[in-house]
UniProtKB/Swiss-Prot annotation:
Reactions performed catalytically: 3-deoxy-alpha-D-manno-oct-2-ulosonate + CTP = CMP-3-deoxy-beta-D-manno-octulosonate + diphosphate
Pfam assignment, any one: CTP_transf_3
PANTHER family, A to Z: 3-DEOXY-MANNO-OCTULOSONATE CYTIDYLYLTRANSFERASE (PTHR42866), 3-DEOXY-MANNO-OCTULOSONATE CYTIDYLYLTRANSFERASE, MITOCHONDRIAL (PTHR42866:SF2)
A GO CC term attached to the entry: cytosol
Name of this chain's protein: 3-deoxy-manno-octulosonate cytidylyltransferase
GO molecular function annotation: 3-deoxy-manno-octulosonate cytidylyltransferase activity
EC number: 2.7.7.38
Class in the EC hierarchy, top level: transferase
Task of the protein: Activates KDO (a required 8-carbon sugar) for incorporation into bacterial lipopolysaccharide in Gram-negative bacteria.
Length: 255
């Protein structure tokens, strides 16, 4: 099995402008992501951007860069443009690694690609990890996922799912039940190129719009998403200045 990694990198960010170029331990953040992805078993790692500043920095450290349109409405549309530019085959597998994940373990990149190759019923694969704290369970910025016993995603939501009705019917309950199966969705995906080609022809789905979750467009069109628990802990990405300082501290101690 072979696969490609595409790292989308946008310069504009409301909370952290110029995020991909932020310095972390002497390197721009996008370089850390690229180096982590290059430690996976990917056939090639490509940075996709619509910004000449990111292109120049990435090419300076030796990355392959594909320039994309600035008008894409979603990251998946951008990914599809890259696969078209590269001339990838319909059955090729592409892993989308976010450009703000400088601590992404290479093992999970391999895992999500391998899982898609092994589960032929699925057009997309992704990962999750357990939720242990009630605060995280209720946090709408932490996306929850439920799946069937074969790992087929049933739903993704910002709402707290599954809801332990009887547990919370008790007075003064402020913890999750023991061995509770809540899972946090980790935003790494592998796709079959054919799925990307179909995705860009679909209108936005109602549930996708309500939840502001792009993956719900896939489920709304009766395509299967495989979900598995990540084989390694995936530290959070960088969305804010506080996140940036946290990642810097972790890299200083050799994370």
């Amino acid at each position: 099995m072979s696969f490609y990694v595409v790292i989308p990198a946008r310069y504009a960010s409301t909370r952290l402008p110029a995020k991909p170029l932020k310095d972390i331990a002497g390197k721009p953040m996008i370089q850390h992501v690229y180096e982590r992805a290059s430690q996976s078993q990917a056939k090639a790692v490509i940075i996709a951007t619509d910004d000449a500043r990111i292109q120049a920095v990435a090419q300076a450290f030796g990355a392959q860069v594909v320039m994309t349109s600035a008008s894409h409405s979603s990251g998946t549309d951008r990914l599809q443009e890259v696969t078209r530019t590269l001339g990838l085959a319909a059955d090729d597998i592409v892993v989308n690694v976010q450009g703000d994940e400088p601590l992404i373990p290479p093992a999970v990149i391999n895992q999500v690609a391998t899982n898609l190759a092994a589960n032929t019923y699925a057009s997309v694969a992704t990962l999750s990890e357990p939720i242990h704290y009630l605060e995280d369970f209720h946090n709408p910025n932490i996306v929850k996922v439920v799946a069937d016993k074969a790992g087929r995603a049933l739903y993704f939501s910002r709402a707290p799912i599954p809801w332990p009705r009887d547990h919370f019917a008790k007075p003064d309950v402020n913890v999750l039940p023991d061995n509770f199966p809540a899972q946090r969705h980790i935003g790494i995906y592998s796709y079959r190129v054919a799925l990307l080609d179909r995705f860009v022809t679909w209108p936005q789905a109602t549930l996708e719009s309500i939840e502001s979750l792009e993956q719900l467009r896939v489920l709304a069109n009766s395509e299967a998403i495989h979900v598995a628990e990540a084989c390694a802990q995936v530290p959070g990405g960088v969305d804010t200045e506080a996140d940036l300082q946290r990642v810097k501290a972790l890299l200083e101690v050799g994370q």
